Amino acid sequence: MKLKGRVLKYGDNVDTDVIIPARYLNTSNPDELARHCMEDIDPDFASKVKDGDIIVAGKNFGSGSSREHAPLAIKSAGVSCVIAESFARIFYRNAINIGLPILECKDVTDRIEEGDLVEVDLNEGKIKLPEKNINIDSTPFPSFMQEIIKAGGLIEKIKGGIKHA
């Protein structure tokens, strides 16, 4: 799975409360979640994010309370992938379960800047910055996790398996 987009960059410890504030948890409407995604940390996020953009962040992305709304808001906003130095484990699992591609990459914030064009090969764990001639290696997901993401999430993967059974 290959993705390409411009970078929206954030620091360490971006928690689920700023990804989608608790005041919007009374809905699971993807469009509504997208409108309020990241608004407490980046009030202009909804107006500047473009389909295919990639979030790059520091350590412990998605920490805080467990809520599937957080990766759903990011995915619904049009973000194609989140690359972070590390993820909170519950966000990591929720992202995979809803089909949001994520990639862990040590020191990625030292090499990628806001607005950079990034190409990601999830199958190989490769990150390329073609305008800067930079290539970064990370650890790819195991194949079964890649299949879940490619299917659009765990539920879609299970539905697909039932159809072929």
UniProtKB/Swiss-Prot annotation:
GO biological process: L-leucine biosynthetic process
Pathway field: Amino-acid biosynthesis; L-leucine biosynthesis; L-leucine from 3-methyl-2-oxobutanoate: step 2/4
Keywords per UniProt: Amino-acid biosynthesis, Branched-chain amino acid biosynthesis, Leucine biosynthesis, Lyase
Keyword Lyase (UniProt): yes
Domain of life: Bacteria
Catalytic function, reaction form: (2R,3S)-3-isopropylmalate = (2S)-2-isopropylmalate
Family membership: Belongs to the LeuD family. LeuD type 2 subfamily.
Entry-linked HAMAP family: LeuD_type2 (MF_01032)
Function statement: Catalyzes the isomerization between 2-isopropylmalate and 3-isopropylmalate, via the formation of 2-isopropylmaleate.
Descriptive protein name: 3-isopropylmalate dehydratase small subunit
Gene this chain is encoded by: leuD
